[in-house]
Amino acid sequence: MKASVHPDYQTVKVTCSCGEVFETRSTLCKDLNIEVCSMCHPFYTGKQKLVDTGGRVQKFRDRYNMRTGQAKSKE
């Protein structure tokens, strides 16, 4: 195996925009700034918003049912 093929694996400090700071290991030699972490991401905090696709689904179902209904009445 070749010596010194892999870069150094160092501890870096990660800072989130919400203020959370934690340490991890990386081949980067500088500290990281991130926008979202597990402390502020809506999925992990339980504050996620559900997108209302019911209107689009209902519109599709109405259009599909109308076409199938017309095909049956022509027979």
Swiss-Prot record:
Residues that hold Zn(2+) according to the record: C16, C18, C37, C40
Keywords noted in UniProt: Metal-binding, Ribonucleoprotein, Ribosomal protein, RNA-binding, rRNA-binding, Zinc
Any one GO BP annotation for this protein: translation
Top-level division of the source organism's lineage: Bacteria
InterPro entries found in the cross-reference section: Ribosomal_bL28/bL31-like_sf, Ribosomal_bL31, Ribosomal_bL31_A, Ribosomal_bL31_sf
UniProt function note: Binds the 23S rRNA.
Cofactor(s) needed for function: Zn(2+)
Protein name: Large ribosomal subunit protein bL31
PROSITE patterns: RIBOSOMAL_L31
Family statement drawn from the similarity comment of this UniProt entry: Belongs to the bacterial ribosomal protein bL31 family. Type A subfamily.
Subunit structure: Part of the 50S ribosomal subunit.
Naturally occurring in which organism (per UniProt): Legionella pneumophila subsp. pneumophila (strain Philadelphia 1 / ATCC 33152 / DSM 7513)
